[in-house]
Every structure is written in structure tokens, then in C-alpha cells.
């Protein structure tokens, strides 16, 4: 998975600073006791040597495909800053009895937020935080007002306003369409790659939570992805786990309750 799986936002997530980016090896077995990997492992009676967290922050679906096929990314993902090389990655997959896949959110979220930064000349930090906070999850006019107020506080130039409006009302559709193409091309290959390494493992495919249902482009993106993932699971004999109401924090990652919810959904699906 990506940062959702790794436990970004939880207090005791483990990592080291690497020459390029971050080294997540300490988190493979030293992950937060509050993340869903820990909770699922506990529910299945597994210790940390038998419940491994391969969540890698910033990962997009083509990056995961590289990791599954080569245990390495050939180059840094410039949009997300992710770059990982772990020779042991494939070996973990070969030895597993159950493998969960959580990937695809960053394929849209990262380029959308980068696009917003570029459109506003990086005046958009507060708006971006609001967009991914989960505060806009349930639409009402008060929350629409918060969104518009954050827009107004940015004090944009004419060109910045025009670029921002284009992104919000047209550009995000283009980004999400491309992201959907990327995920739907990569995900079946990820499943095939895992099966080539370990044909006997149960594969659990997690669905998606939309942190910003107020944005129509993201609504469509995550709705389409959930339908695709569910259909893929049916076609490939995977265990599909729906997580539509995972609670997210200010950075868009699951809260402690969000991880508990995801873990419960997985454990129920494995019964």
C-alpha cells in the first residue's frame, strides 16, 4: 500500500531519513500498534514477524507495479517524491499467506494538490489542507462556505484565480481521468505479478475512501475506482473490502478510528 497502509499520521510510525527520501524498513515490522496492519495481525493471532507492513508513502499504482515486479522503482516519482528500493520486497510477497493491496488514491490526489500549488504559486496550503481533511466529507452549506472562504483568503492575482478555477472546475476531471487510466492499467498487472510470485496466497483488495466528496471530480474518480476494484475482485477471485467511511485526519490519512474501521472490515471479510 501507500501512506494509508504505512500509518502516516499515527504517533509511532517508524522510518529513517534516506539519501533520497525516506527509508521505511523500520516500519515493516516496527509499525504503529494503531495501524490496520497491527490490528488485523492481532485479530489473526500473528506477531510482527508474521504481519508485515509494506506501506510506502507517496506510492502510486505504477510505482507499486515496479515494486512487485522488481522490488524497486527505477527512478524517483517526481510528483510525490517517492523512491524505494527494497530487495526483500518480493521475498515478503513470496512467503505470505494473505496479501492486502491498497493503492490508487495518490494517482489522483498528488497531481491535484501539486496542480493547485502551481496554479496559486503555492499560496494554497490552507485550501489543500481543508480539501484533504475530511471536514468536507458530508456536504452542507456551512462547509461549502468554509471552502469558498479558504479560496477568498488566498488573495490570488487574476492569472492565479483563472488557473485555480480552471483546475477546480475542469482540470481536476482531466487529472482524475488520467489517474483512473493509470490505476486500471496497473492494478490487474499488480495482481498478476503477485500471483506469479505466490499463486497460493489469498489476495485482499481494499476499496477507496474519498476524503473530499464536495469535489465532483473526486466523487466520480473514487466511485469509478470502487466499481472497478469490485469487478476486478470478482473476475480474479480476490477478497474485496469496501471502506467508504474510513475517518480521515487533517492530512487526509486515516485516524485511529479510521484504521480500526479498516481493520474490522478486513477481518470481517476474512471470516
Predicted regions and their residues:
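Glycine-rich, phosphate-binding/catalytic loops in enzymes
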Residues: 14-23, 70, 115-121, 221
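First exposed extracellular module after export/assembly in secreted or surface-exposed proteins
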Residues: 49-52, 65-66, 196
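Charged, often glycine-rich, active-site loop that binds/positions anionic groups
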Residues: 57-85, 253-254
